[in-house]
Structures are given as C-alpha cells and as structure tokens.
Amino acid sequence: MRLKQGSFLWYLYLDKIYCLLSVRNVKALAEYFHILDVHGKNTLNDVLFYHFLHHVTDLKKAQINIVFDMLDWNAVGEIDFEKFYMLVCMLLAHQNHLEGQFMYRHSRPVFDLLDLKGDLRIGAKNFEMYRFLFNIQKQELKDLFRDFDITGDNRLNYQEFKLYTIIYTDKLQKRQKTEEKEKGERKRSLYSKCHIK
C-alpha cells in the first residue's frame, strides 16, 4: 500500500516517535475532513470513504471496504473524525515504515480495531485480513501466533498483543541500528578508498 504522491496526505508530517500529527496538521486534516463531509453530518459514509482512499492510496476496492468495515465497528455506515484521524496516522506510519512503532504507541486502539467480535481477543483470521495495513508478512503472522499466543487458543489477548508490539519494535530498532552501522562502514570504506588513490 502506498500514498499517491501529490495527494493531501503526502504533505502531512507524522512524528516518528509518537506516530501522531502536530496540532497544525490536525487542524488542516480536520478542515480537509469537513470538505469531504458533503452531507454536513461530521461523518464520512462508505461512498465518500471509498473515493477518499481511492484518491490518496493505491488500495483496491476490496481492501478499502475491509478498512471501512474495521473502522465502522458499530455498523452505522459512517466513520467520524476520530476514526478518520486514526486511519490517516496509520497510512502515514505505513508510508514512513513506522508500522511497528505505530502499533506499539497505539496498541490499545489498534487491538480494539482488530478485535472484530468485541470478545477481547484477536484471531489469526482477523489479523490476516488487515496485515496489509501494518506491512506484516504471512510468515511473520504465523510466527506471531506461534510465539506470543501464551494461552494456546490461537487468539491473542491484549497482553499478548502488547508483548508482541514491544518485541517487534525492539527488533526493528536493532535492525535499523545494524543497517545504519553497515551504511556508515560502507561510506568510510568508500571514503578511504578515494583518498588512498
């Protein structure tokens, strides 16, 4: 999933630590939401939502419908600004490769969104449906349920999910540090080769 270059969301800045927008960006996003809300009900229905996501992302229609159903958990056929804001932060986190950080910082709201039945557990099938939002590969998903399903019921409760987000974020940070270190070593090596000649 990618944001389309030049769309409104492309110009918003997501804080890399907390995965939130600045007050100025939230104000601009609220204004954008009110422009999209042609019915003046402070909500977006499924048609408006589809056209918005189709305009700003490369998601397919089925994926957009899945996302709408996830956000419209009480099945009223509309989403309000709070859910819209969460979606935009999710999209920006995905665009900036901060999916793990987003899940860690917002573990409770993410868990509640993925808990479709409201029974305080996330099944593998539910997570599979939404893994494209968080850039989780199939093997990672299998490993997640194998390693963190402590109760053994093939469903994650909130504590298991939170533990996963902590360890996942830690792994990502270690991987990024290793990549930065290797990149620095390559630059030093290239620099020294240039100066030897």
UniProtKB/Swiss-Prot annotation:
Region (Disordered): 177-197
Subcellular localization, as worded in the UniProt entry: Cytoplasm; Cell projection, Cilium, Flagellum
Keywords: Calcium, Cell projection, Cilium, Cytoplasm, Flagellum, Metal-binding, Repeat
An example Gene Ontology biological process: sperm capacitation
Pfam families the UniProt entry points to: EF-hand_7 (PF13499)
Amino acid composition bias (Basic and acidic residues), ranges on this chain: 177-188
Function field: Auxiliary component of the CatSper complex, a complex involved in sperm cell hyperactivation. pH-dependent Ca(2+) sensor required to activate the CatSper channel. Sperm cell hyperactivation is needed for sperm motility which is essential late in the preparation of sperm for fertilization. Associates with the CatSper complex via direct interaction with CATSPERZ, and senses intracellular Ca(2+). Together with CATSPERZ, associates with the CatSper channel pore and is required for the two-row structure of each single CatSper channel.
Protein name: EF-hand calcium-binding domain-containing protein 9
Naturally occurring in which organism (per UniProt): Homo sapiens (Human)
Organism phylogeny: Eukaryota, Metazoa, Chordata, Craniata, Vertebrata
